Amino acid sequence: MAKKGKKYQEAASKVDRTQHYSVEEAIKLAKETSIANFDASVEVAFRLGIDTRKNDQQIRGAVVLPNGTGKSQSVLVFAKGDKIAEAEAAGTDYVGEAEYVQKIQQGWFDFDVVVATPDMMGEVGKLGRVLGPKGLMPNPKTGTVTMDVKKAVEEIKAGKVEYRAEKAGIVHASIGKVSFTDEQLIENFNTLQDVLAKAKPSSAKGTYFKSVAVTTTMGPGVKIDTASFK
């Protein structure tokens, strides 16, 4: 494993690895220890007390963060008929039918999110092996398989983020950029944490929020005290 650079070591020395900080303190410290020479993303990782091998403990969904993520998301919509005009009016970057299936099969991936109307899923299903591993396959749970393409596109453009618990029960998500104010990041964090709290499976036993940490791109992780979490 490569040794971390001097800038990282200096930044990490400001973080007490034995301490669990309040949300406010952790976000402030994560911003202060950002070492990237660009407007880094602020990421959070929630380790949840769930068993993702059980169908009723798989957590997946999407939430619109009140202050967005600071990242412009490029959207591809699979639709036909009047839904094409609806998607265009909502501000989608690309919209169409089978022609985009062919483009993707040929290696085109100039988009971040895929939305599809239910009647297009037969075509989109052909791309399962390509879109699935990249986390781009439309899914009703995240609101990306819908007839309301206007709402779907507008929410994505407004800062909607998808979340999904990985095998170890960890949910990773971006809550903004280092250039955001502390208040904006705290509000985004609280919104995501509240959504995850409400998504707790009834069959999950013991401590739900096992550990939470916030970090910036290339920066050290800062542990958050979960004692006050519901």
UniProtKB/Swiss-Prot annotation:
Part of the 50S ribosomal subunit. Transmembrane segments: none annotated. PROSITE patterns: RIBOSOMAL_L1. Pfam families: Ribosomal_L1 (PF00687). It comes from the Bacteria. Keywords: Repressor, Ribonucleoprotein, Ribosomal protein, RNA-binding, rRNA-binding, Translation regulation, tRNA-binding. This is Large ribosomal subunit protein uL1. One of its GO terms (molecular function) is structural constituent of ribosome. Belongs to the universal ribosomal protein uL1 family. The gene is rplA. It comes from Staphylococcus aureus (strain N315). One of its GO terms (cellular component) is large ribosomal subunit. The lineage of its organism: Bacteria, Bacillati, Bacillota, Bacilli, Bacillales.
